[in-house]
Curated annotation (Swiss-Prot):
This protein is located at the 30S-50S ribosomal subunit interface and may play a role in the structure and function of the aminoacyl-tRNA binding site. GO terms for molecular function: structural constituent of ribosome. This is Large ribosomal subunit protein bL19. InterPro entries: Ribosomal_bL19, Ribosomal_bL19_CS, Ribosomal_bL19_sf, Translation_prot_SH3-like_sf.
Length: 117
């Protein structure tokens, strides 16, 4: 195994839930304010996901006070404390950039119902 691959595999987080585009998630982010460190929740819809090993990232979009806010998170970053999947969305595309131009009820995503086994 390559030395770079070995170092990258040690840095990967293994406790991540499986989520995809269209899912509504809550990301707990560590925020430093002076000497204090606290957790800040960022809840929104995943509009893009990039799987590139240690360089994996995902983009989350939410509407706050009528303004759309997008934030790109590095999947294996130490600044991410936890990721919780609230609901799975039913979408047919991998990148949901078209949601940027939609507002109100048009921007809603149907929920994907899971069959229990």
């Amino acid at each position: 195994m390559n030395l770079i691959d070995q170092i990258e595999s040690e840095q990967l987080k293994l406790d991540l839930p499986s989520f995809s585009s269209g899912d509504t998630i809550v990301v707990q982010v560590k925020v430093r304010e002076g000497e204090r460190e606290r957790l800040q929740a960022f809840e929104g819809v995943v509009i893009a996901k990039k799987n590139r090993g240690i360089g994996s990232a995902f983009t989350v979009r939410k509407i706050s006070h009528g303004e759309g806010i997008e934030r790109v998170f590095q999947t294996h970053s130490k600044m991410i404390d936890s990721i919780e999947v609230k609901r799975h969305g039913k979408v047919r595309q991998a990148k949901l950039y078209y949601l940027r131009s939609l507002t109100g009820k048009k921007a809603r995503i149907k929920e994907k119902l899971q069959l229990k086994k």
